[in-house]
């Protein structure tokens, strides 16, 4: 389910998702499990006659959780059965004509995660920070 509000210079979108995996021992799902999550995405676009023409500042806040327990044989749908996570991402973007450059900064935190199934070289770190730089041509 998605809803978008658009009133320049703002675009705000929210969504909710739900998934379900039924019990199926043939694939190792000895208990049914599901995920549910949601996000809010907000984007501010600077006007062409502003001091920052071509600049957009998107921000995304997300949450997802899974149900079930490892003891009952639930499948791992996230960071272990019954785990959850939230994240925030900022993606400043500049576009000139058909050329763009975009940076992305993201932070995620896992909650009620199973040790060894999360982040880092041993899978035991409950948080992760990432950065990325992208540039390209739109066609």
Per-region residue spans from a language model:
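Outer-membrane beta-barrel pore domains
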Residues: 1-139
């Amino acid at each position: 389910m998605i809803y978008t509000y658009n009133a320049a210079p703002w675009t705000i979108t929210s969504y909710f998702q739900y998934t379900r995996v039924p019990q199926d021992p043939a694939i190792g799902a000895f208990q049914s499990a599901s995920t549910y999550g949601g996000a809010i995405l907000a984007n501010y676009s600077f006007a062409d006659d502003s001091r920052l023409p071509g600049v957009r500042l998107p921000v995304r806040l997300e949450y997802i959780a899974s149900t079930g327990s490892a003891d009952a044989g639930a499948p791992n749908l996230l960071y272990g059965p019954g785990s959850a996570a939230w994240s925030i991402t900022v993606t400043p973007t500049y576009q000139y004509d058909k050329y763009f450059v975009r940076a992305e900064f993201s932070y995620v935190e896992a909650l009620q995660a199973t040790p060894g199934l999360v982040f880092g070289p041993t899978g035991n770190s409950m948080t992760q920070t990432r950065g990325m730089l992208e540039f390209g041509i739109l066609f």
